[in-house]
Amino acid sequence: MFTYTVIILLIAALLSAIALFIVHRMPAFKLLFQILYALVMVVLGIFLVTRIMKPINFKTERIRRENAAIERLKDIRKSQESYKNKYGKYTASFDTLLNFIQTDSFEISKLELRGEWNQDEMTQEQAIKEGILRKTIIKKSVRDSLFTPDFNINDIRYIPYTSNTQEFVMKAGEVETGSQLRVKVFEAYALYDILFNGMDPQEVINYKDQRYKITEFDGVKVGSITEANNNAGNWEK
């Protein structure tokens, strides 16, 4: 952008010099040339402003889209972790995950003290057996536990700004840690080429190169199926 700006300024300076020369040598054409000169300068000014605003506009739209994708990936992570807490594994299927959110429930234990309980002399199990503690199991829907009533669950699978035509890629698996423990893992991601579709191609390429040097990935992603990373998002790097 800097090179283009310099070129435009040089052209403007050259035109100004030519204008002064012609006005001095050909006074009869002074008014006509002033009009033409003004029009040319307006066009150059518009072009210059456009060049300056181009990366600014890209950054604004890029941040908007990327933040929307990150929020949706956080919702996927929250749902996946709840699914694993109940079933001991992650799922690679959005249909399974959405069905879990919409139809499943959590069991919540509630303890009610009904007498004097000396915890140094009696365990919780003994207190329940003796009737000193009353244990009640209640169920709460997964949806109500994780999301607000107005949240559209069905949108969770779709990459923002794709008119619900492109889904996040989601995978699940198992990896072995350095201490030889088998750990359940998952990942979900959106490639920048899809997330930034319709935006300036060169600006997209520049941003992809910039982020790849940091994350070694051409998109925004949560989790990993190649390593246990505690379901971290690569936007945190």
Language-model features, listed with the residues they occupy:
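Hydrophobic membrane-insertion alpha-helices, especially the h-region
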Residues: L14, Q34-T50
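Membrane-embedded alpha-helical segments of integral membrane proteins
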Residues: M1-H24
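Alpha-helical transmembrane segments
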Residues: T5-L9, L32-L39
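N-terminal alpha-helical signal peptides/signal-anchor transmembrane segments
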Residues: E66-Y87
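Amphipathic alpha-helical segments typified by the pilin-like N-terminal helix
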Residues: F47-E71
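Non-cytosolic membrane-interface motifs at loop->transmembrane helix junctions
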Residues: F2-V6, K30, R62
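Low-complexity, acidic interaction segments enriched in glycine
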Residues: K84-K237
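Membrane-interface helix-boundary motifs at transmembrane edges
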Residues: V23-Q34
